[in-house]
């Protein structure tokens, strides 16, 4: 099946084999009904694709569908699939889930294989499920959820979360240059050969990423280590953390992606940098420690 990654560079690309996670799901009886549109090269939060069109938001047509996995969220709302797969490097499953009113999980880093996925920033990249319900996401991952509710858990709350005890949980702006350097490394040879095939706002972002210096990268790597320490300390004594998915209202469909990107990823990107599981359900984000995916999903049921 043609797999473009939302890019004109790969317009005629047809993989010779399915990604392992897709092959596993098909072996379990799932049927692939199609591929969905996305933000070019999974590097954007609005799914405004200059090559293949803008992904519509079926629930709220005046607003962005979010990205980068906007097509997966839209397909679920339209009833074109029972479940969908997405990737999430800075919020690309959770943001469209929040914008379109579906459920999406960024699992613990490494829980789902990213083999067969065109990389964006490899140590931040995650693949995960999207569905109309928490149980739908759990089914894709073959996770059995514990029978617990928020009342059974110690819940921390950050950044204006709707429930729980206030927690001083860190954001991750200082880590962004590490993410950018990884993006730059992926495209360092590809971009000069095919620059004219990259969309305009993607070109600008890729050029910034390629320009990240060794010193900026090393500083950001140290900031990532500090983030891990601060996050562990902040969640000490709690089972899960509840936050908003977005730090801003859902932008209009014709927004300028570069102007809304930082605000839309402010609360999602930290969990990519940490590798912790994080669920988006009804605009609420539920996060937990690595390996606690089933617990995060179970807690998320409280918001359905």
Q: Model-found features: residue ranges?
A:
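Gly/Ser-rich catalytic/binding loops embedded in alpha/beta enzyme cores
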Residues: 1-89
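Structural helix-boundary/capping segments
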Residues: 23, 27, 77-159, 218, ...
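Short, hinge-like loop/turn segments at secondary-structure boundaries
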Residues: 50-53, 100-104, 178-183, 260-261
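Short helix-loop capping/hinge segments that flank enzyme active sites or metal/cofactor-binding pockets
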Residues: 1-8, 152-161, 177-228, 232, ...
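Short, well-ordered beta-strand elements within core beta-sheets of diverse protein domains
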Residues: 9-13, 125-132, 206-212
